[in-house]
């Protein structure tokens, strides 16, 4: 896909959805002795999401895992949708689009792993992070330059 085609797709976007682990984090999960886990988020992602909201777009997370840290980070960033523990991400995706009152063409989805491919393919703009699985990068409309 050419840059201009990606830009045309991006111009229609009203909602940005993303996986969390490997997209908003480096993909590592620190399992704590006392139970639970710990994740590290980058401030640049937070600023980008804040700017996205200022431009009038909404955002959200669809994740197969469940984490209190993800919930806190998403709410702290003002994300409209947080779907965790999604064994069937496509169902959560469809529910989110209905709730947001947007079409597939008006959604961008950022992913990094194989279970993100169906959502990327259903989206108007499917984005893979730079260090995504090769199969994910191959199917993306756009691949980021950096993680």
Please place each PLM-identified region on the residue numbering.
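A positional/architectural concept
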Residues: 24-54, 63
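Substrate-recognition element of Asp-dependent hydrolases with the DxDx(T/V) motif
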Residues: 49-73, 84
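Short coil/turn segments at beta-strand junctions that form active-site/ligand-binding loops
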Residues: 12-14, 57, 105-106
């Amino acid at each position: 896909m050419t840059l201009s085609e990606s830009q045309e797709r991006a111009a229609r976007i009203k909602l940005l959805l993303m996986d969390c682990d490997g997209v908003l984090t480096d993909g590592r999960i620190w399992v704590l002795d006392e139970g639970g886990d710990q994740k590290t988020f980058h401030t640049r992602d937070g600023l980008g999401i804040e700017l996205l909201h200022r431009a009038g777009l909404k955002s959200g997370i669809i994740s197969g895992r469940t984490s209190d840290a993800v919930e806190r980070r998403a709410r702290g960033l003002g994300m409209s949708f947080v779907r965790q523990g999604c064994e069937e991400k496509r169902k959560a995706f469809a529910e989110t689009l209905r709730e947001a009152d947007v079409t597939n063409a008006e959604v961008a989805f950022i992913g990094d792993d194989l279970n993100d491919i169906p959502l990327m393919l259903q989206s108007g703009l499917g984005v893979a992070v730079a260090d995504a699985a090769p199969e994910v990068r191959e199917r993306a409309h756009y691949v980021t330059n950096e993680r």
